[in-house]
Structures are given as structure tokens and as C-alpha cells.
Amino acid sequence: VVNTPGHAVSYHVY
């Protein structure tokens, strides 16, 4: 899952 721009919580999964 990549970071979601415009979302309340943007997260990165490595």
C-alpha cells in the first residue's frame, strides 16, 4: 500500500 494523498492518515507499508 502506498501513501494516500488527500487522506487523513497517509501511511507507507514496506
Swiss-Prot record:
GO terms for molecular function: neuropeptide hormone activity. Its main location: secreted. GO terms for biological process: neuropeptide signaling pathway. Keywords: Hormone, Neuropeptide, Secreted. It is found in: Secreted. The keyword Secreted applies. To T.molitor cuticular protein LPCP29 C-terminal region. Strong inhibitor of fluid secretion by the Malpighian tubules. Uses cGMP as a second messenger and inhibits fluid production by decreasing cAMP concentration. Reduces isosmotic fluid secretion by inhibiting electroneutral and non-conductive transport pathways. Reverses the stimulatory effect of diuretic hormone I. This is Antidiuretic factor A.
